[in-house]
């Protein structure tokens, strides 16, 4: 369902991109979903300061920066994505500042923002990079770390060391996989597993063949969420981010599955600092879905930071 929450006329088309060779190369890799709806929902205005908590390849930041004198603080824990965003947003110079950090660990200091956007989940660039191990479509090591390195556990570590009970719980909790027990037992029988294709084949062998999606999709999602601590990071962000806004400032969060959307919905409803602006989630129209299939599962929620006087009356 598409909603116009502001009464604003249809926003100018944002999909043409900022002119320049660097941008066009990046833009072929990734198109930000619900871009127009996000910018309208944030009520981006000249001179505003905005936080892009998951800059990715820079699509939402670029759209914000097209408004005169706006500034953006752009965060990402993925160094590769941050490097691409730097290229894309280079024409905006000092109006954008980059930080290599997970949004749950961000410290704004004295800065307060007119709007915050977080586009959750994995970007198309990450999914299409074989060496990252996020997708069953490519032969690669079972890594799945968003930061691309460090000492954190990899997906291979979890697959090869967790008990069948632990794996089953992980696949059910983070992937909502109804065949979690069967898959976990088969993995324990066949391990060690070192590559994405090995894991995908083992999962496929454990469950019925007729599935609406690839049989390994939910298992890969669950492992990615566990490896990167995504649930805990999102909970921390949802708790802290309202305090980063000026009174009247807006939050926009785009999620791609219920494990992301559910905490946003319930946290915001219970938060006395916020007014929820979206009774139902905003979803992509058919035209966007046709041009960008990733948009089909995207859900946008919006909230507004209450002023102290509004909080006292609520």
Curated annotation (Swiss-Prot):
CDD domains in the record: AdoMet_MTases
InterPro entries reported in the protein's UniProt record: RsmH, SAM-dep_MeTrfase_MraW_recog, SAM-dependent_MTases_sf
Catalyzed reactions per annotation: cytidine(1402) in 16S rRNA + S-adenosyl-L-methionine = N(4)-methylcytidine(1402) in 16S rRNA + S-adenosyl-L-homocysteine + H(+)
Example GO biological process: rRNA base methylation
Membrane found in the keyword field: no
Listed GO CC annotations: cytoplasm
Binding site for S-adenosyl-L-methionine: 58-60, 76, 103, 119, 126
Keywords carried by this UniProt record: Cytoplasm, Methyltransferase, rRNA processing, S-adenosyl-L-methionine, Transferase
EC number of this enzyme: 2.1.1.199
Localization per record: Cytoplasm
Family listed: Belongs to the methyltransferase superfamily. RsmH family.
Function description: Specifically methylates the N4 position of cytidine in position 1402 (C1402) of 16S rRNA.
Annotated protein name in UniProt: Ribosomal RNA small subunit methyltransferase H
Encoding gene, per UniProt annotation: rsmH
């Amino acid at each position: 369902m598409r909603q116009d929450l502001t009464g604003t006329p249809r926003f100018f088309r944002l999909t043409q991109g900022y002119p320049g060779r660097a941008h066009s190369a990046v833009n072929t890799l990734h198109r930000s979903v619900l871009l127009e709806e996000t910018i309208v929902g944030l009520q981006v205005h000249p001179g505003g300061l905005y936080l892009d908590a998951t800059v990715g390849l820079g699509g939402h930041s670029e759209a914000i920066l097209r408004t005169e004198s706006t500034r953006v603080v752009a965060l990402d824990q993925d160094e590769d994505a941050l490097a691409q965003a730097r290229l894309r947003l280079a024409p905006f110079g000092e109006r954008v500042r980059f930080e290599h950090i997970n949004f749950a660990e961000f410290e704004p200091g004295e800065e307060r923002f007119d709007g915050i956007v977080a586009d959750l989940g994995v970007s198309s660039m990450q999914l299409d990079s074989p060496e990252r191990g996020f997708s069953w479509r490519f032969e690669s090591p079972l890594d799945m770390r968003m930061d691309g390195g460090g000492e954190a556990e990899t997906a291979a570590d979890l697959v090869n060391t967790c008990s069948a009970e632990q794996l089953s719980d992980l696949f059910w909790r983070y992937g909502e996989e109804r065949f979690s027990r069967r898959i976990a037992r088969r993995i324990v029988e066949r391990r060690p597993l070192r590559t994405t294709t090995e894991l995908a084949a083992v999962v496929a062998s454990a469950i019925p063949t007729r599935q609406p999606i690839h049989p390994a999709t939910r298992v890969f999602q669950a492992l990615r969420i566990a490896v990167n601590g995504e649930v805990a990071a999102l909970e921390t962000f949802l708790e802290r981010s309202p305090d980063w806004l000026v009174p009247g400032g807006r939050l926009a969060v785009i999620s791609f599955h219920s494990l992301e959307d559910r905490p946003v919905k319930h946290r915001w409803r219970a938060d006395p600092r916020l007014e929820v602006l979206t009774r139902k989630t905003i979803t992509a129209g058919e035209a966007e879905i046709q041009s960008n299939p990733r948009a089909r599962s995207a859900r946008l929620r919006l909230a507004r930071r209450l002023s102290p006087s509004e909080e006292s009356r609520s």
